[in-house]
């Protein structure tokens, strides 16, 4: 890696009709204390105030710039267009409701210079606006973790085992939770059809898998630099929600991605939002790139069908969405001579009752849930500061530091109660009795 003390960073923000949330995203970008930084907002034909929001932010901070592919090209092509505008250095991609934590870019630059690697990941916290996933807003923080070097071969083998790219905290996808050098991005482009980087229907998880295969190892930082945001306009929520407006948004999205079928081993089916299926599509697509050096074990299609069905049974999908995914899985099963087995799986599997996400304050083995509405965290900018401060507190508040704080407090209290010397006697300060007229 170039040892320049301030390597160039570009944050691309492909977006469409998210002006209400984008303004808070850009506030988190503008607060960065790093000069060699460019924020590129690529607008895919928004009909709201997106351009005005970006240009107003750009007048205040020249690091922020508005670009557009010139029409409604769809998410995938908008990402590719934005990536085309990036100058040599490092790149991070975000959505129009994601953000950067305070001092995020400068801290990330220090980490990359320390490791000397061109690919890195971190545990990004997650913020949900009120009314997005639930009535109240929510901030989710990961428990403190240690930084480490990850072997790419181990990471890729784990993707085959779990078939759940999005749950892998070490995934180096440069969408919100990772960063990549433009040299690695260009390396993938040279292997890809038509010189594109984004060759799968959706752009996020593929980047982590294909880039991991380009290097022997990459860095994982226990410190977060960015934050995921979820708003009512988020694409993933559009498919899980069952109201008519959400269905319309997801139908519009499918129209754009239908031109890019999944891998031939997935029967060339249209895009599926099932994480299991997407993980397999990313793996197979990367594997087939000419000269791609990544390696992973053979994928069991029977296991993929089983895990996909379990995901579909989780109670988050509405009835018509379930039917669509079952049809896709049935075609994939038929491609591999597993249709009878798959239909037996369907007959023997029971769906969970419809459920809502966890709401309120809570804690699990690896995450902390904070009710943002209760604590006055209203938007992504607020959440970014809260995540940064709470993350620092969690990292530094070790059992040892807590014990030292308690011991110091006790020692101070004991010193304050200790009896000292008595006051000097009257002879040393009295001027004698004075008469009163």
Give the ranges of each region predicted by the language model:
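Nucleotide-sugar donor-binding/catalytic module of glycosyltransferases
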Residues: 1-246, 403
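C-terminal subregions of glycosyltransferases and related glycan-biosynthesis enzymes
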Residues: 123-124, 226-437
């Amino acid at each position: 890696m170039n040892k320049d003390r301030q390597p160039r960073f570009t944050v691309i923000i492909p977006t469409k009709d998210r002006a209400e949330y984008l303004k808070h995203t850009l506030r988190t970008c503008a607060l960065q204390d790093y000069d060699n930084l460019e924020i590129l907002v690529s607008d895919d034909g928004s009909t709201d105030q997106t351009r005005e929001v970006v240009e107003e932010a750009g007048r205040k901070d020249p690091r922020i710039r508005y670009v557009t592919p010139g029409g409604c090209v769809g998410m995938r092509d908008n990402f590719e267009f934005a990536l085309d505008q990036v100058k040599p250095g490092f790149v991070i991609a975000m959505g129009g409701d994601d953000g950067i934590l305070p001092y995020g870019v400068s801290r990330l630059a220090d980490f990359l210079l320390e490791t000397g690697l061109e690919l890195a990941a971190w545990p990004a916290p997650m913020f949900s606006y009120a009314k997005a996933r639930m009535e109240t807003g929510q901030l989710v923080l990961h428990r403190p973790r240690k930084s480490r070097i990850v072997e790419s071969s181990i990471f890729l083998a784990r993707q085959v085992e779990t078939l759940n790219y999005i749950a892998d905290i070490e995934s180096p996808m440069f969408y919100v939770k990772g960063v990549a050098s433009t040299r690695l991005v260009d390396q993938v482009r040279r292997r890809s059809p038509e010189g594109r980087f984004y060759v799968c229907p959706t752009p996020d998880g593929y980047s982590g898998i294909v880039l991991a295969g380009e290097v022997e190892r990459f860095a994982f930082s226990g410190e977060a630099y960015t934050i995921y945001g979820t708003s009512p306009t988020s694409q993933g929520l559009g498919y899980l929600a069952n109201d008519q407006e959400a269905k319309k948004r997801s139908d519009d999205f499918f129209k754009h991605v239908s031109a890019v079928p999944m891998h031939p081993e997935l029967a060339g089916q249209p895009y599926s939002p099932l994480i299991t299926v997407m993980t397999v599509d990313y793996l197979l697509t990367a594997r087939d790139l000419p000269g791609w050096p990544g390696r992973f074990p053979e994928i069991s299609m029977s296991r993929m069908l089983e895990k996909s069905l379990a995901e579909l049974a989780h109670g988050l999908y509405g009835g018509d969405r379930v039917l669509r995914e079952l049809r896709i899985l049935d075609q994939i099963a038929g491609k591999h001579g597993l249709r009878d087995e798959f239909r037996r799986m369907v007959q023997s599997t029971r769906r969970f009752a419809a459920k809502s996400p966890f709401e309120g304050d809570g804690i699990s083995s690896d995450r902390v849930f904070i009710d943002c509405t209760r604590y006055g965290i209203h938007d992504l900018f607020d959440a970014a500061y809260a995540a940064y401060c709470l993350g620092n507190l969690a990292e530094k508040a070790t059992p040892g530091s807590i014990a030292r704080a308690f011991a110091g407090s006790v020692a101070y209290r004991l010193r304050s109660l200790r009896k000292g010397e008595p006051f000097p006697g009257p002879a040393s300060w009295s001027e004698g009795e004075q008469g009163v007229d």
